Each structure stands twice: as C-alpha cells, then as structure tokens.
C-alpha cells in the first residue's frame, strides 16, 4: 500500500513456524515522496539521535514548567552521542558519571539547573555521581514503537523565536506504520548553532 505521508509498504513472503524457530520480519517500508532538505536536516540534527528507546524526551508530554517528567539518566547517553559524535562508553565510568560532567551536558540541551537535575535524576550524593544503566533483557523489553525512527514532517517558526517540529514515529518493522505517534517538539536555536529542547506534546493521544 502507498500511504498519504508518502511511504510504500510491502511484505515479503518469508518462512513461518514450524519451518523456522524464530519469526522472520518480511515487512518493508520505503519512503517514495522525499522530505524537504530542511526537514531532513532537522530530523538528523534534532531527533534521530534521540529516538524512542531508552529515554522519554520524544515520547512523553513535558514543557519548561514540568521538567521533572524527563528521564535524565536515560537521556544522557543519547545527548552524549549527539554532542561528541561517538557512543557513550560506560566502561569509562565504572563508578557513575561525575556530577559536573553529567550536569553540564544536560544543561546544554535542556533548560534546567544543576539543583533541579540532582532532584529529578538518580544522583549518588555521597560519591557525587549520576547512575547509568545499560539497556538489556533484565530492564528493557523491545517494542515496535521503541525501534521506530523519528522523522520531522513539518517546521513552524514561532513569534517567540522558538521552532516547533512536527515529528512522526515511523515503524518499518512488522506493523509497517508511518506514524505510530505524531508529536510536536519545541526547540530554540542560538546564534552559534546550538539549541535546547523546550517541550514535547503527543498529538491525538498518541
């Protein structure tokens, strides 16, 4: 089928149990109608590095008055990868992430104070470190939504200088859904090219 958002979904014939012991995904989702250059750039710059797995920045409702809703310990590794262009290596921090290092990165991308981060995140006050736990079979169950890819489909410049990005969570596995959820992410860009996330709203109850 061809979707209204410009995706073509088809399904391959794949073996099924009992021929195989594991389910084989034959679903394929291909974008036919291209995004604009600006939409592609915004997708890569602001949302693709975050995704919907291991953090809740893009998949929960929050704003500058409700910063306590974010999972700061989960968000850290994704912001780290965005800033440094390399994966966060937990082996470098066997005893937790040092306070100053954790807080400075979070405050670079989110409008929170060090005091708020200590209150909202899991903070080891004795050792002055923040806890980080790798996702695994004991603390995470993969979902189709979690593996979805965020894609900016609309960009709106607001009068207050912020920008609202309309984002679709595109799932190309099994369910082949070009918008598992749609949400509006508000960001503010600085003259030097840096930016902060200011809020997220799930549209139509997800």
How does the language model describe each region?
Residues 1-206:
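Mature, Sec-exported extracytoplasmic domains of Gram-positive
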